[in-house]
């Protein structure tokens, strides 16, 4: 008799369990931002085809554009069910404020990130992280924290970037967070020509303090592939490699020949709305192919 669970669509899960498996299997997980239904479908279908666990994430700004956190959560849940994906999928808040975290827990997200790196003092970051860890875990939700501001601009919030303090990373880790983002020279968005690269020395110091806690590499779209692989291989075997939405949407990242810019809508159609639908479908498939290449090149599931 066949197993009734084979081929059955999975429900959303929190990210903690898939990160534990990644740690044990010495591979990284991909986290991809979504801004709309088309991008959500492309990411889900790519993860299914690549048989890769997936963290699908949304910023507060993107959620506002889509109608709010509840609309975003319901859309993702419906897309997971409609596509019938069987790989584990977590819905994660990306760079959330203290207030955003409460809203996402209420909306049905299965994972949250509290970015306390922009608070006035580290103590505020510490206190609020502690509170949110207790709340999230009581709801079965995983939580990511951040120490040391990641450079560049993310969802309208700018940071000069800094190397995280290993001692502060340990204090946050000891609160029981499920994964930790720490600045090691990485930047959101476009990397400048004089970028010094990742500080693997600082990363080693942080790992020595936090042990087996999975670490997160933000700004992954601009980091050269050799540094990504070195980051995974030497220091961050269960890292959640974040592929930021801005560079992906420009079609400038991914393996050679695997840009993510969708093709133009078919020409010569008598009705404009038909061209729009055809173009949207082609865009989903084109993005999906580029994402599969990323997953197969940089990740193992």
PLM regions: where:
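N-terminal amphipathic/basic-hydrophobic helices that include classical n-h-c signal peptides
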Residues: 1-10, 291, 295-301
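N-terminal amphipathic alpha-helix/helix-capping segment at the start of soluble metabolic enzymes
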Residues: 3-30, 77
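Alpha/beta enzyme core
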Residues: 13-21, 36-62, 67-86, 95-213, ...
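Conserved phosphate/anionic-ligand binding catalytic regions in large, soluble enzymes, centered on
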Residues: 32, 36, 242
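Glycine-rich beta-strand-to-loop/alpha-helix junction loops that act as flexible
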Residues: 217-221
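C-terminal alpha-helical cap/extension of soluble enzyme domains
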Residues: 225-299
């Amino acid at each position: 008799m066949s197993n009734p669970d084979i081929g059955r669509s999975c429900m959303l899960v929190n990210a903690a369990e898939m990160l534990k498996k990644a740690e044990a299997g010495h591979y990284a997980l991909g986290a991809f931002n979504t801004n709309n239904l088309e991008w959500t479908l492309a990411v889900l279908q790519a993860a299914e085809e690549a048989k890769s666990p997936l963290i699908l994430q949304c910023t507060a700004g993107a959620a506002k554009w889509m109608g709010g956190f509840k609309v975003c959560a319901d859309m993702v849940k419906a897309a997971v069910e409609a596509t019938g994906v069987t790989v584990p999928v977590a819905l994660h808040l990306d760079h959330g404020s203290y207030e955003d975290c409460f809203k996402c827990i209420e909306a049905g997200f299965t994972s949250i990130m509290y970015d306390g790196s922009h608070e006035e003092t580290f103590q505020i970051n510490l206190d609020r992280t502690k509170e949110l860890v207790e709340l999230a875990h009581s709801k079965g939700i995983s939580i990511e924290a951040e120490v040391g501001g990641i450079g560049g601009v993310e969802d309208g919030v700018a940071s000069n970037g800094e190397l995280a303090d290993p001692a502060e990373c340990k204090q946050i880790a000891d609160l029981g967070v499920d994964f930790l983002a720490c600045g090691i020279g990485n930047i959101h968005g476009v990397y400048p020509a004089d970028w010094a690269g990742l500080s693997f020395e600082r990363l080693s110091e942080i790992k020595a303090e936090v042990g087996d806690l999975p670490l997160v590499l933000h700004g992954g779209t601009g980091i050269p592939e050799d540094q990504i692989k070195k980051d995974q291989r030497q220091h961050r075997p269960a890292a959640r490699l974040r592929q930021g939405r801005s560079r992906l949407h420009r079609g400038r990242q991914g393996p050679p020949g695997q840009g993510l810019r969708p093709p133009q809508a078919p020409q010569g159609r008598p009705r404009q709305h038909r061209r729009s639908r055809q173009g949207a479908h082609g865009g989903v498939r084109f993005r999906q192919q580029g994402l599969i290449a990323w997953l197969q090149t940089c990740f193992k599931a």
